[in-house]
């Protein structure tokens, strides 16, 4: 008997064909293209809004400004430190000998007081005075080489509290008020800085 006239064979062939078709449909539904597989992942992504991005940009700009300000402040502090070190170095050069010169002032005072004593015709005393005068000149010249200036006002000069120290105030009819009557002790300054003010008597 041929298969065409066999109902059982026809049924088996039909069932087999249906299974093949079902398998192909399942493959199409399950496989699809790559875009369908990626779709669930795309749906899970969250992109920031424009406002959020602008806010982040603003915060970053503020941070940049803050760091720039800190840098400029640090640079200014370094410049100030460098200038201060340069000033201190210059002061050391200009006033490093201050203590030594201050210690020499009593020597100059002693020579000046000795020369202020009454003159004598005694040859020995006269020779001593000449030696003291030469020594004082030599001392003043040496001090001048190191930036020392003598503060020696004249009677009648205006009193300057920055350079003079008033030891007393006296009423003198012919003198103008606040003028120097007498110099008791010379003063000294080093490169414009007063080491010791001149001690004077002032008219009141």
Curated annotation (Swiss-Prot):
Disordered: annotated segments: 1-52
Record's keyword annotation contains tRNA-binding: no
UniProt feature, compositional bias: Basic and acidic residues: 7-22, 38-52
CDD domains on file: GrpE (cd00446)
GO cellular component, one term: cytosol
Top-level taxon of origin: Bacteria
Gene Ontology biological process terms from the UniProt entry: protein folding
Acetylation as UniProt keyword: no
Subcellular compartments: Cytoplasm
Matching InterPro entries: GrpE, GrpE_coiled_coil, GrpE_head
GO terms, molecular function: adenyl-nucleotide exchange factor activity; protein homodimerization activity; protein-folding chaperone binding; unfolded protein binding
Pfam hit, one: GrpE
Keyword list, A-Z: Chaperone, Cytoplasm, Stress response
Subunit structure: Homodimer.
NCBIfam families: PRK14154.1
Family affiliation: Belongs to the GrpE family.
Function: Participates actively in the response to hyperosmotic and heat shock by preventing the aggregation of stress-denatured proteins, in association with DnaK and GrpE. It is the nucleotide exchange factor for DnaK and may function as a thermosensor. Unfolded proteins bind initially to DnaJ; upon interaction with the DnaJ-bound protein, DnaK hydrolyzes its bound ATP, resulting in the formation of a stable complex. GrpE releases ADP from DnaK; ATP binding to DnaK triggers the release of the substrate protein, thus completing the reaction cycle.
UniProt-recorded name of the protein: Protein GrpE
The organism of origin for this protein: Coxiella burnetii (strain Dugway 5J108-111)
Taxonomic lineage: Bacteria, Pseudomonadati, Pseudomonadota, Gammaproteobacteria, Legionellales
Name of the gene this protein is made from: grpE
């Amino acid at each position: 008997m041929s298969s065409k006239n066999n109902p059982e064979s026809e049924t088996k062939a039909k069932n087999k064909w249906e299974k093949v078709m079902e398998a192909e449909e399942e493959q199409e539904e399950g496989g699809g293209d790559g875009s369908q597989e990626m779709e669930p992942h795309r749906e899970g992504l969250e992109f920031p809004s424009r406002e959020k991005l602008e806010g982040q940009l603003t915060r970053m700009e503020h941070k940049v400004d803050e760091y720039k300000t800190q840098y400029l402040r640090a640079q200014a502090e370094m410049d100030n430190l460098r200038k201060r070190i340069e000033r201190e170095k210059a002061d050391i050069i200009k006033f490093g000998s201050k203590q030594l010169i201050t210690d020499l002032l009593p020597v100059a005072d002693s020579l000046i007081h000795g020369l202020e004593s009454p003159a004598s015709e005694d040859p020995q005393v006269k020779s001593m005075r000449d030696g003291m005068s030469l020594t004082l000149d030599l001392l003043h010249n040496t001090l001048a080489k190191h930036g020392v200036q003598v503060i020696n006002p004249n009677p009648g000069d205006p009193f300057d509290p920055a350079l003079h120290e008033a030891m007393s105030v006296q009423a003198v009819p012919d003198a103008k008020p606040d003028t120097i009557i007498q110099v008791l002790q010379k003063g000294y300054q080093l490169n414009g800085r007063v080491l010791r003010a001149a001690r004077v008597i002032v008219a009141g």
